[in-house]
């Protein structure tokens, strides 16, 4: 029996995405908007993934992840793309671009927000500002919020509200089986500091705080 090559697996994945009742958005190296979608904070032209997939929901992430796991397709996950070693991209792996999972749902009464896995810090700050709220964020607006938070989360508000990692109250994760799960206590403990090792985080719940006064002192 012939062994599948990496190229044939990528082609099979592209056909799978196109064949869904609602086709899953994706681009290849030959797509006219590939360079724009591939562009990021660290632009290394030698890191050009053969396929960039752009899911729009946690369910689509699970669908794609299940297929790639089943067929042995290696992939990376990209949001802000600020990894200093460029690990958001590999030339021999699919990139799962989560930036369309950018919803921010604010509960003013409960003082929490549900933040999509692809939310950039600029999107979060804007959404919170519209409601007179604030949460710890980094100083660079194009950083992906969850990647920043789960690996420490240092920023200008940490002296008042704590580190970004302290803000993760709950999380929704696509696990190694390609299933969407709510993080239990053990998984939450792992996510707070090493989240990328435990699955694809598609949503977190964080506390938010009324923005009452802004000054140089606070």
Question: What spans do the regions from the language model cover?
Answer:
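N-terminal accessory segments
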Residues: 1-160, 217-218
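C-terminal cap/substrate-recognition region of VAO/PCMH-type FAD-linked oxidoreductases
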Residues: 134, 171, 176-218
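Short, structured patches in soluble enzyme cores that scaffold and shape functional sites
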Residues: 100, 108, 117, 139, ...
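A short, compositionally biased
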Residues: 9-11, 165-170
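Short gly/pro-enriched beta-turn/loop segments at secondary-structure junctions
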Residues: 128, 166-168, 214
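Short Gly/Pro-enriched turn/cap motifs at secondary-structure boundaries
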Residues: 159-165, 190-192
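A generic structural signal for short, non-catalytic loop/turn and secondary-structure boundary residues
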Residues: 19-21, 89, 143, 166, ...
């Amino acid at each position: 029996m012939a062994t599948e090559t990496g190229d044939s697996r990528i082609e099979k994945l592209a056909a799978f995405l196109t064949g869904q009742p609602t086709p899953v958005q994706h681009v290849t190296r030959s797509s006219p908007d590939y360079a724009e979608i591939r562009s990021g904070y660290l632009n290394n032209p030698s890191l050009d993934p053969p396929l960039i997939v752009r899911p729009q929901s946690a369910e689509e992430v699970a669908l794609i992840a299940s297929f790639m796991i089943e067929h042995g397709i290696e992939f990376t996950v990209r949001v802000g793309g600020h990894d200093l070693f460029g690990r958001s991209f590999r030339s021999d792996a699919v990139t799962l671009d989560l930036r369309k999972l950018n919803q921010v749902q604010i509960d003013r009464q409960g003082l929490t927000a549900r933040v999509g896995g692809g939310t950039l810090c600029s999107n979060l700050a804007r959404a919170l500002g519209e409601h007179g709220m604030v949460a710890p964020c980094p100083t660079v607006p194009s950083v992906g919020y969850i990647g920043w938070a789960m690996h420490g989360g240092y920023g200008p508000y940490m002296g008042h509200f704590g580190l970004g990692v302290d803000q993760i109250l709950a999380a929704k994760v696509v696990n190694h089986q390609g299933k969407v799960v709510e993080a239990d206590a053990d998984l939450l403990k792992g996510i707070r500091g090493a989240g990328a090792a435990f699955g694809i985080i598609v949503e977190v719940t964080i506390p938010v705080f009324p923005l009452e006064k802004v000054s140089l002192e606070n």
